[in-house]
C-alpha cells in the first residue's frame, strides 16, 4: 500500500520490536506531500476517505492576507519563502507550508492605507502623482486619523522596501489555498531575529 500512518512499526521504549498481529489497513494510508511551489496556479482534486474531496495545491502565486491591527484583508502576490522553523530545504526550494514565513507584495496594503487615512507609506514609483480626494472624503480621512493606531516601526520599514512578511495560516496541500496574516509587533521582531541568526549561521 505504500505510505502508512500506523505506529506498529515503532519499537518499544526498551528498544524491542512489537510483534506484527495485522497488516496495513486502508484507513491508515498516507500520501506524498504536496510540496507547494510559487508559480502559476495549479490545484488538483484528491478523493479521500468517505468520498470527500481535498484540494492539493502544487503551485500558487497569490493568497488572501489579513492585516490584524487594521482589520483589513487583501489578495496579494507571494514573492518568496524566507523562513521555515522545521526545514531549511523548504526555504531553499521556495516550498511553502502552514506556518512558514513568506514575503508578499506590499502594494494592496499601501493603497488601502492611502485611501483610508490619506497617508502615503512606502516607496513611490517615478511618475506617481498625489491623488486628490474630495472634501467629503478628506473629512472622513481626518476623523479616521484621530482614532488611528500608530504604525509599527518594523512594518513601516518593510513598506519602504515594498515587501511585507506574512505567515501562512492555511494548509496549501489540504485546502488548495495559501492564506495568512501579516507579521507585526513582537512577532515580526522575533522572526526578524530568527532570520538574521540563520543568515549568520549560513555564512560561517
UniProtKB/Swiss-Prot annotation:
Signal peptide: none
Record lineage: Eukaryota, Rhodophyta, Florideophyceae, Rhodymeniophycidae, Ceramiales
Protein name listed in UniProt: Small ribosomal subunit protein eS8
Coiled coil: none
Biological source species: Griffithsia japonica (Red alga)
Family statement: Belongs to the eukaryotic ribosomal protein eS8 family.
Pfam families the UniProt entry points to: Ribosomal_S8e (PF01201)
GO biological process: translation
GO MF annotation list: structural constituent of ribosome
GO CC field: ribonucleoprotein complex; ribosome
Domain of life according to the entry: Eukaryota
UniProt KW keywords: Ribonucleoprotein, Ribosomal protein
